[in-house]
């Protein structure tokens, strides 16, 4: 799931093997977040929800970055790349058929943020 902002594009990458990362096009991000149980659970939810919406995606070989205010979804399979694009506000306000996928992706980002805020070595 890629979201276009004026200053950068944020990419949340979730894989079936449990790998979860966040990449920021202007630099930085979070790699290996799937090691955190809550992040992994949110990622599994995203994959499960996305699977239900596969018919809403189109086959495509191009992977352009989303424009500001747009969200681009990708599904990579062994045989194809599927894509869909929508307005972030429409997704956020449940006005788009892929809103559930968007909100599940936001759940992954929330869990990544919470996991990165936990103190290291202390009581958690």
Each language-model region and where it sits:
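A short, sequence-level motif marking secondary-structure junctions
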Residues: 16-18, 38, 87-92
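Long, charged/polar, surface-exposed segments that mediate recognition or autoinhibition
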Residues: 27-55
């Amino acid at each position: 799931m890629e979201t276009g902002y004026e200053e950068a594009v944020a990419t949340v990458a979730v894989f079936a093997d449990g790998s979860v990362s966040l990449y920021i096009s202007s630099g930085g991000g979070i790699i290996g977040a799937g090691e955190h149980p809550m992040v992994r659970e949110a990622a599994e939810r995203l994959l499960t929800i996305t699977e239900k919406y596969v018919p809403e995606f189109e086959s495509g070989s191009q992977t352009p970055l989303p424009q500001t205010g747009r969200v681009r979804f990708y599904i990579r399979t062994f045989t194809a790349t599927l894509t869909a694009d929508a307005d972030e506000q429409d997704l956020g306000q449940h006005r788009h058929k892929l809103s559930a996928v968007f909100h599940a992706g936001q759940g992954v980002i929330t869990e990544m943020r919470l996991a990165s805020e936990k103190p290291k070595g202390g009581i958690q």
